[in-house]
C-alpha cells in the first residue's frame, strides 16, 4: 500500500488528531460518509486496525515500511511498541518536523527530498534516514533553503521541542542528544494494539 496523498482532513475525521499529517482540525467529529454519525460497536480487530492506521498516516509511511519497522522493533530489546514509536520518531523527516523546520511531516519530507537539509555537514535526501544521538541537523547554506525553513518556522506544527533535541533558531542548527522518550510523542496512540495487529502478519 503506497503513501497516502488524498484529502488529509478526511483522514483526521476518521482517525482523530494526527499532528504530523496536518495542522488543521476537522470541523465534524464523526467520520466522513453517509453513515459516519451512526457508528456501530467496533470489533477488536477494527480497533487495532484503526490504531495501526493512525501510525501510518501520522508518520506518512507505507504499509511495507511499517511492517519493516515492526520487525526491527521486535528484534530490539525492551518494549516492542515503544521501540516502534522511537524508530518512527527518529526518522529524519519527523526530526526536521519536531525541530520546527516544517509545519507537518509531509512538508519536512519535501525539505529533505529536495536536498535542503544537512546531517553532519552532508546533504541527506532520504526521509527515512534514522537519526542518532550526536547527529547535527542544519539547513543548507543557500538562500532558498534558509527562506523556506524560516517561513515554515513562523507556523510550527508543534510548539514544544522534545527533550532529546535542541535547536538554535538564529543559526537554524539542531542537534540530536538522545532517543525520544515516550512522554514526548505527540500522537495519541496505543502502540500495543499496533503490535497486536501485526502479531500474525509481520
Curated annotation (Swiss-Prot):
Q: What family does the database annotate? A: Belongs to the universal ribosomal protein uS4 family.
Q: Which PROSITE patterns match?
A: RIBOSOMAL_S4, S4
Function statement: One of the primary rRNA binding proteins, it binds directly to 16S rRNA where it nucleates assembly of the body of the 30S subunit.
Q: Which domain of life is it from?
A: Bacteria
Gene Ontology annotations of biological process type: ribosomal small subunit biogenesis; translation
A Pfam family the protein falls into = S4
Mention any one GO cellular component term assigned to this protein in its UniProt record: small ribosomal subunit
The gene for this chain is: rpsD
Cited SMART domains: Ribosomal_S4, S4
Matches recorded under CDD domains: S4
- Its protein name is Small ribosomal subunit protein uS4
How this chain assembles, per its entry, is: Part of the 30S ribosomal subunit. Contacts protein S5. The interaction surface between S4 and S5 is involved in control of translational fidelity.
Which residues does the UniProt record annotate as the domain S4 RNA-binding?
90-152
Amino acid at each position: 500500500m503506497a503513501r497516502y496523498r488524498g484529502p488529509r482532513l478526511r483522514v483526521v475525521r476518521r482517525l482523530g488528531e494526527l499532528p504530523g499529517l496536518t495542522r488543521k482540525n476537522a470541523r465534524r467529529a464523526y467520520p466522513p460518509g453517509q453513515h459516519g454519525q451512526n457508528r456501530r460497536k467496533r470489533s477488536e480487530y477494527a480497533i487495532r486496525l484503526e490504531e495501526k492506521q493512525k501510525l501510518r498516516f501520522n508518520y506518512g509511511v507505507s504499509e511495507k515500511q511499517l511492517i519493516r519497522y515492526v520487525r526491527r522493533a521486535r528484534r530490539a530489546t525492551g518494549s516492542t511498541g515503544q521501540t516502534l514509536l522511537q524508530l518512527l520518531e527518529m526518522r529524519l523527516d519527523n526530526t526536521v518536523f519536531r525541530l520546527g523546520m516544517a509545519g507537518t511531516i509531509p512538508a519536512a519530507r519535501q525539505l529533505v527530498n529536495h536536498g535542503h537539509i544537512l546531517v553532519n555537514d552532508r546533504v541527506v535526501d532520504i526521509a527515512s534516514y534514522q537519526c542518532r544521538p550526536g547527529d547535527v541537523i542544519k539547513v543548507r547554506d543557500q538562500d532558498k533553503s534558509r527562506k523556506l525553513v524560516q517561513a515554515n518556522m513562523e507556523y510550527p506544527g508543534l510548539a514544544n521541542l522534545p527533550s532529546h533535541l535542541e535547536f538554535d533558531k538564529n543559526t537554524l542548527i539542531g542537534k540530536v542528544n538522545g532517543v525520544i522518550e515516550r512522554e514526548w510523542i505527540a500522537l495519541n496512540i496505543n502502540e500495543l494494539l499496533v503490535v497486536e495487529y501485526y502479531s500474525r502478519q509481520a
